[in-house]
Amino acid sequence: MKIYEGKLIAEGKKFGIVVSRFNEFITNKLLEGALDALKRHGALNENIEIAWVPGAFEIPLIAKKMAESKRYDAVIALGAVIRGETPHFDYVANEVSKGIAKISLDTEVPVIFGVLTTDTIEQAIVRAGTKGGNKGFEAAVTAIEMANLMEEIK
């Protein structure tokens, strides 16, 4: 029996990160967490490229462009969509999650969903590096594992 498991080694791998500027006080923390995880696992600065987009809705387009370039072993999508008083939250959260999943399937490049979808700012703050850990860090660890797993299964 053959068992495949992605290793947590970022050395020699290239990563693209797409970050939403909207709710930047949150997304900056997610980015810090992602960079921390990548570097702790051996990624070099020159193997990490970051693209800033205006909002979460724009993440899938740039993530797709990065994935289609085949320059990256994985792409990490970081953003924060916080529920307001209108249905806008639902539209953005749904489209971003569907878009990111579709890119991975279409390009066979792991595109990791690190977009917070929370009901309150407080929930977002907790998930961006306080009591709830840092979801950017977790997304980067997932990217490392998936990049290695994809290489292993080829």
UniProtKB/Swiss-Prot annotation:
Keyword Cytoplasm: no
Listed Gene3D superfamilies: Lumazine/riboflavin synthase
GO biological process terms, semicolon-separated: riboflavin biosynthetic process
Cited CDD domains: Lumazine_synthase-I (cd09209)
Residues binding 5-amino-6-(D-ribitylamino)uracil: 22, 56-58, 80-82, 113
Cross-referenced InterPro entries: LS (IPR034964), LS/RS (IPR002180), LS/RS_sf (IPR036467)
Pathway: Cofactor biosynthesis; riboflavin biosynthesis; riboflavin from 2-hydroxy-3-oxobutyl phosphate and 5-amino-6-(D-ribitylamino)uracil: step 1/2
Cited HAMAP family: Lumazine_synth
Record-stated family: Belongs to the DMRL synthase family.
Name of the protein described by the UniProt record: 6,7-dimethyl-8-ribityllumazine synthase
Gene that encodes the chain: ribH
